Amino acid sequence: FRVGRKSVYLLGKQGQEPNDSMDYKGLTIHYYNKPPVRPNMLYRWLNYQGYRRKRQIQDSAGIARQRSMQSLYSLYRQTRIQERLASVGIFRYAEMQYIPRDTAFVSDTLDVRVIAALDKPYDAELDFNVTMKSNNQTGPGAAFTVTKNNVFGGGESWNVKLNGSYEWQTGKASSSLMNSYELGISTSLIFPRVVFPRMGDREYDFPATTTFRLYADQMNRAKYYKLLAFGGNVTYDFQPKSTSRHSIT
């Protein structure tokens, strides 16, 4: 079978059916009121010809044969696209349908239809913990994280995390006055792709992320030291093939 027309149906926040559409490089995008995802990103995620084995044999017959092979249906490519839609983390569900253009199978063309609904735009998480150390210090800690999904319409997420802890040393001696605390704030911007000069347009067969992070921490250890730390980092996680995965910070 060969892959024919490709279309995406993006449901509204309350499950509304699309009421408008647009065409981007042969990809028909149906949406409710306004596109919640940038057309160029949908095209990158669903570009069927972009997901193919690197070891695919290309003969000297040239481009015509290569293009012909790329238009063929492939379970490998279908799996890669489904993984990509799941990994961006902005869809509540996404369903891929392959519809025969001719039910009598006279035609060998399958039209691809993707039906998807976006997840909630915000996530919040609250964690509590209690620490007990060998130096008799004990105390509670908490962390609160708020995440905004699909920040720029391309699957990006931005989060802010606040964390704090307080510990005191148990005992009857004066050491029981040795109380410690820690306060921190961090923010991260996560892209579901590699963001790097000359590599920003490249799509790997497997999910990849780029994380930009800034943080600041205030730490007080009674009768020992006080420490104010702040900084940032960039982390690249990518998987060029199924048997290897890389993380660079």
Describe these PLM feature segments:
Residues 35-38, 57, 66-249:
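Gram-negative/organellar outer-membrane beta-barrel architecture
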Residues 7, 16, 22-34:
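Conserved oxyanion/phosphate-binding beta-strand-loop segments in alpha/beta enzyme cores
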Residues 23-25, 40-52, 61-67:
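Acidic/histidine-rich, surface-exposed loop or edge segments in extracytoplasmic proteins
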Residues 1-3:
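Non-catalytic accessory/assembly modules
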Residues 30-32, 51, 71-72:
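Mature-chain termini and adjacent capping regions
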Residues 11, 28-45:
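Flexible hinge/switch segments at interdomain interfaces of large molecular machines
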Residues 9-10, 115:
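Generic structural detector for well-ordered beta-strands
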Residues 12-20, 33, 46, 50:
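Structured extracytoplasmic
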